Amino acid sequence: MGASIYLGKVLSAGTKGCNIILPTAPSFVGLLDTYPNAAAAYSLRKLRTAYTGNCIRVRRSSDNAEQDFGFVNNVLDTASLLTFVGAGSGFVTTWYDQSGTARNATISTAVEQPRIVNAGVLDTLNSKPSIINPNAGVIRR
């Protein structure tokens, strides 16, 4: 006769139930939680557990409007980004420093801004959001 699971206990014929310990999802630990003394830190993933700021500020090509984007589940909120950009392209104007030193990287010249959305499609590398710099502009802090 096989064992059955009932309310967290394994029950089988002729034996008492025993507790089952199910693994829980690991807590998020950011890279900067382990290495807290960074002078500056930029990523499309959240790097510090306590960081509550935005990830990037993006300009959309259709009307040059700009908007900040944060994180969902510790990665860039790509759904909101794609909704904002629509069928056009999106360019990063500010990449926010997650180190806590406020050394945000900005680039105000539109033709030098790196792209993150191309014609409504998220730029990716190995299936991860990626910032592409087709014009070789430099983001400055």
Give the residues covered by each predicted segment:
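Register-specific beta-strand positions within repetitive beta-rich fiber domains
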Residues: 117-118
